[in-house]
Amino acid sequence: QDICTVVITSCNENEGKTTTTLQLAKSLAELDKRVLVIDADMRKSVMAGRNTTAENPAGLSEVLTGLTSVKECLYQTQYEDLSIMFAGKYPPNPVELLSGQYFEDLLKTAKESYDYVLIDVPPLGSVIDAAVVAAKCDGTILVISDNQVRYRQAIEVIEQLRKSGSKILGVVRNNIKKKDGGYYKKYYKNRYQ
C-alpha cells in the first residue's frame, strides 16, 4: 500500500514533532517529491511563527469552517516542491473540525496533488486530535524525546494509535544526550591504542 498521508505526533509538548515534520518535508522536497505540510495543531501551533512573517496567516481552521479556500491558505516555501498550510486561528472546536467530512475531503484532494502530505498534530498524550487525524491517514510517526517520556506513557500513546486504526510507521528518538561512548568507546580505545 502506498503511503501518502502521514501524521507526526508525540507524547508531550516540546519533543520536536514540528521540527521533525519540517525536516522530513524538506528532505522529501529535495528528492523532488511534491510535499504539503498541514499544521493541524490548531490548539497551540508554533509552525507559522517559525515559517512566515505574516501575522496570523489564514490556514486549516479557516478552510474547515468555510471562511477561505484551500488555495488561499497554501504558502510556498524556499523549496519549489514544498508548501505549508498553517493552522490558522484557534477554533472553539478543533476535534469536531478534524473529524468532519471537510477534513477528509481536504486529505483526498491533497493526495491527488502531492506525493506526500505530512500532518503535524498536537501531542497525543495531551488531547485526542492526533488519534482522530491518524484514523484518516496512511500512517503515523511518533516522536519521542529522550529522557522526557516514561515507558508506560509511550506504550499508552502507541495503544491509542493502534485503537485508531493507524499504521505506526516508526518512532523518531529525539534529543538524545551524547554519552561517554559506552561499550564501543572502550572497545576501540583498547583495540587501537
Locations of the language-model features?
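P-loop NTP-binding module
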Residues: 1-193
